[in-house]
Amino acid sequence: MNNTIESYSNENGCIYHGDALEILKQIPNESVDLIFVDPPYNIGKNFAGRKDKWKTDKEYLDWCYQWIELCLQKVKPNGSLYLMTSTQFMPYFDLYVRDKVTILSRIVWSYDSSGVQAKNYYGSMYEPILFCVKDKNNYTFNSEDILVEAKTGSKRKLIDYRKNPPQPYKTEKVPGNVWDFARVRYRMEEYENHPTQKPISLLERIVKASSNPGDVVLDPFSGTFTTCYVAQQLNRRFIGIEIQEEYFKIGLRRLGIASEYKGEKLEREIKSYQTKISKERTLFNFG
């Protein structure tokens, strides 16, 4: 790796502080089993003082196509790629990659409402995900590891009389392409100070399904490093990239790689409601 790129590692993987395009270029081709990409969406979000907004849509898409090409180079011939972006830009992603890889699923991550919703049109309640593979005849998909309850609407077990002898219908199934996972909220244990943090449960499904223990999982826009965290918990190896120093520090702490950075002790931010509870306990502690 280039010496100008800041990196930290442990026995499970490595995270890099710097520009994703530059760092991706230095990762060996066909060396990664699974890539999950959750890039800036070009919708004006504030990421630690850095605005998620390009001058034009064309500039944003041209930038996206660069890292998509690099990711396609880095993933193994039997590897998988999951791509996220906003609803308005996903059609461009879909058209761009469909003649380069096989799109197996167009996933809808559906979530509950929070805050103020649109009043003059139908507000967006989902984020799209493309599940792509290089070789549709040779890729990892561990269906048994991601089974969910097969809801029949019946209180009694349904019997399949087509079989001899008749047998109960299976109570579990592989999830469809509509995924219901709650967004990460402030009071959740997993919450970190980031405007678009993805839930652990979402990444668990992806990592379990499309990689095996010991495989390499890459996230070029790591944010709070949830992908790397899940990969480590599931005995995969990880590569994380993040350009924002504030979020890079979250990765160092969350992955147990470092407890200090540039002389600063890395600790979880105490939430306002936790401070209030602590003060109340102190107030009523007469012992």
Q: Where are the predicted features?
A:
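PRPP-dependent phosphoribosyltransferase catalytic core
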Residues: K249-G287
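Core catalytic lobe of class I
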Residues: N2-K249, L283-G287
